[in-house]
């Protein structure tokens, strides 16, 4: 059991609870995970390997690290482990190396550091090594085993957490490179809330002049002097977003073109995404084609006796001359029997916005934001600018654990309506724009600039 003192969770977990919670994850994934045909692992064998590792953990931090290691084998962005909240908020376990990084052009670049490192860490320097190990090799060996990483452009935030956060006072030597020079800096992890950050001195991102007609936490609308409406949406979790945009419909209707910026939009409710997309679509429309696992145990029972099922991979099934029941039994044995579905979205928009449209996206465009991209790609002539989206959308099944954290298993996989292969790849832009370190230094938003140029040509 978990013991409590002063309202906080003690950091020991019984072996019985460790076994139960690991087993619960193993079982729930077996019968609910939506991508068994996409991963090449023996789930039962991995469970047996994880058992001794989990039992050997000394505290809740180590325990959840091992759970994360186990679940990351499923290689899906909607499947993962979350630590207990009080553990994540505790400097004892989640202190930070006092440097702030961002992935730019495939490298991890310094955007800020604690004041005491102002003269030792180069601003905009590139992280080259971690404890003497090449950074790419270190990330592959020490970070990727614990996180979803199939789309490397979409996991940079998780990588930075792995690199920077850890137990209080733990140390690391980071090697930075800039202008042909190398900087080795020994650092220790400290309480992130007490770090005094340096100002990078870079200008804020330049924006086209114009009038802001809506400025809320999760949505902003600006009409540029050239008559382009820029709609920035940071989340589709907020159910009030469509209504707030609809409230500005008459002003939007006067625009010469439209930019919808969903870069960094972590998703939420695909119904809200549909409601925004509806302003650019006439009538009702198809939304979010998907598949979910179907389980009928009798077919699995029959399949267990089929010798001809052995050593046949899902890729080889098309070559086999099986009847429908045999095919169903094979798929049921491997939990890759899926039911397809397509949603029809009712168009509740106050009208149709006509004019050229650009959608801005990047590796942090995730989940319901990708559903928005899907609908816009399928039903409009919008131009998509930026970089690939995350490549993960679906319906996670959440379970809260007695030990204080939770896990999620993706139960529904979304399929691009235009036939594009997006699993762990994301939707591709029509116009790819790569962001550089110089863009950060100069305060340039090259993606936005490109979209404005396209719409005003």
Q: Residues of each region from the PLM?
A:
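Conserved acidic, small-residue-rich alpha-beta core segments centered on
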Residues: 269-443
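Active-site diphosphate/adenylate-binding microenvironment
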Residues: 1
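Flexible, low-complexity junctional segments that flank or bridge functional domains
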Residues: 4-293, 300-309, 388, 393-406, ...
